[in-house]
Amino acid sequence: METLTIAYATDENYAKLVWCSLKSLLENNANFFTVKAYIISDNLSNSSKDKLSNLISSYNGKICFIEFDSIAYGLDNACTFQNGKTSYARLFLAQIVKENKILYLDCDTLINHSLCDLWNTDLEGYYIAGVKDIIAPQLKQDIQLLPTDIYINAGILLINIQEWKKNKIESQFIAYIKKMNGKISCHDQGIINHVCKNKIKTISCTYNVMTPFFYLSSLQIKEIFELKDYYNDIEIKEAISHPHILHFTAGWHIRVWYSNSKHPYAYLFKKYYNLSPWKKTPLPLGHLTLKIKVLRNIFKILPFSIYLKILRIKRERAKCCLLYTSDAA
């Protein structure tokens, strides 16, 4: 039996989400000898640290807290951290992880089955493994990737720490950030996909079941995001029916940590939340932006072909605006 080594990154705002994710992982992974968790934090309170420590110790696991600023000194002032400091934490894991590999998890995840098969993925010759993401083609172009290049979602990553150390991947991350003056599409995710190009292994989409899977078919995903290759409908349907890792990404559903979420797995989050030390604090109401509501309603009302035309016109206008702004500058 092995030790499952994992990492989360959080600040005080997301501590309760980390607790729920970690609880779900511990509940579904008794087949591991133990679980060791690295928590990279940005001013996480002692109270929240105690809650997480008590949780993992109740399963005979181990936990280690690392302050983000203590490992990210190489960035200097190269980043503005628009998504918050801790979203960049995964870039620095090789500094702190003693093991040869680690599973990084975003805090907006729930683990629903054993991760044994994922953990045993062969990473020889690869820096990283993950699930192919759903992104606009312009975002790949922005980080100097071709449309055919693999681009994964960085919310769930199986990382070959041994290779990161050997090839000084952290230094490459920092060099790319500075080269781009900190302005990189999708921030840390864009950095990872650029630097790890040609060394990325794709895995089953059951290990990162994202929100769009619940309302878009494989063909619609490929058409909307101009993807040549993606998971097929059988793979996606199997993933949403029997997810190993749920990832509550942005989309047409209000996020599950809001009381009015209609995400198909909102009930599962509430189950773990009601077991947490925060259970007496009611979940707040959430809201979708007007832009998302409009796009969702257009998709529901109009034929898909018309929706696609509207979307492409919108993208072309955005490109023109960008070009005009660049020329004016």
PLM region descriptions:
Residues 36, 41-65:
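Acidic donor-binding segment of Leloir-type glycosyltransferases
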Residues 24-32:
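Short, acidic, metal-binding catalytic loop of nucleotide-sugar glycosyltransferases
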Residues 324-329:
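Conserved small/polar residues in nucleotide/adenosyl-binding loops
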Residues 1-4, 10, 17, 166-323:
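A glycosyltransferase accessory/donor-loop signature
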Residues 106-110:
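The conserved acidic donor/metal-binding loop of glycosyltransferases
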Residues 113-140:
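Conserved donor-nucleotide/metal-binding helix-loop-beta segment in metal-dependent transferases, i.e.
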Residues 102:
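Short aromatic/hydrophobic "clamp" motif used to bind/position activated sugar donors
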Residues 59-92:
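Active-site-proximal specificity loops/subdomain of glycosyltransferases
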